[in-house]
Amino acid sequence: MLTYKFLLIKLTATVLIIFPTLSFSVTVNDELRFATQMLSSGSMISLESAENSALMATVGEPKASLGHWLRAQSLYGLAGVGYDFDKKDRPFLEEARVRMIPLPNNLLPGNIFTFQTANSNSQYVLLMETSAFRLFVYKIDEFGNLSYENSFYSSIGLSGDNKTKEGDKKTPIGVYRFIKEISNPRADGFLGDIAMTLDYPNAQDKRDGRTGYGIWIHGVPKNTYVRSPKASDGCLALSNKDIELLKQYITYKKTHIVIVSKVSWLDPYTWKNNSKLIQNLFTSTSQVAGNNKNKVVAYYRVSKDRPSVALIRRGEIFYRDYWDETNKGLKKLLSERLN
């Protein structure tokens, strides 16, 4: 049984790396994050702030169960009433822990590098950090620079990430394209009104023997705001409102999502230098150099134990090329044509 005091310690200790939060207009997600942070402080003033933010969250979204739960805990604390938690509180504790993870400020992901090129395929790229249950959207400008656009809370597979086989209830790690949109993906409405399909398994997944299919980004039942952090069969599950917002960033068969366990955050100066280094590596790599029809559009690093992925335009056709980074440069493993 967890006590109220232990909850405060547990939530605070979970956040090991602290970033300043980004500045943007206050949303339900922001209110939930702030309420959780204030509740973890434990002072009377903080509890009052937590109660107020939790109330605002539930006014903005009555289906936000975490908001109701946080408000109840705040009121218990203000009244000096002790409370013991049991298993029915666990989903709220898990979501509250996730809400405590701050967003990065003025940093760029070292997992994604984009380059200046005409017809670069998409204006946006998505990045899912499964350990933070956070889906980031980045805009790509005409010079190949990345800038933060938006982010969303997202549930992942019930058994975590790093999918290897069909039915393991894990979210895959890798680089994937959005393929198409499905309306009313399940008759009972459990997946919301919209699902966006991904092209899992990709060529590298197949080569490595990873199986399964039907990895989507979808919504939640109408009587729900969000699901618990680990709740799906392997898909990414967003709130129905967030799914509608996400749609504006997606161009089917063009927009990519990079799914990683942990993002490698870089300051903009380091990101730019790494981007130039990668461009130079491709220029000096025999498989690419000497063919002016090849244009490197983007370069994605998934993890140290996975090949990196280059999005290449050859004429009017796009390819995903899979590369090993070695001490002698880049070694091409596989090329996948994107229809």
Language model feature labels by segment:
Residues 37, 74, 180-280:
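Exported/periplasmic cell-wall-interacting domains
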Residues 103-215, 221-225, 331:
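Gly/Pro-biased beta-strand-loop elements
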Residues 29-56, 60:
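Alpha-helical segment of the N-proximal tetratricopeptide repeat
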Residues 309-339:
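Short beta-strand edge/turn micro-motifs at domain boundaries
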Residues 75-109:
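Alpha-helical linker/edge segments of TPR/alpha-solenoid repeat scaffolds
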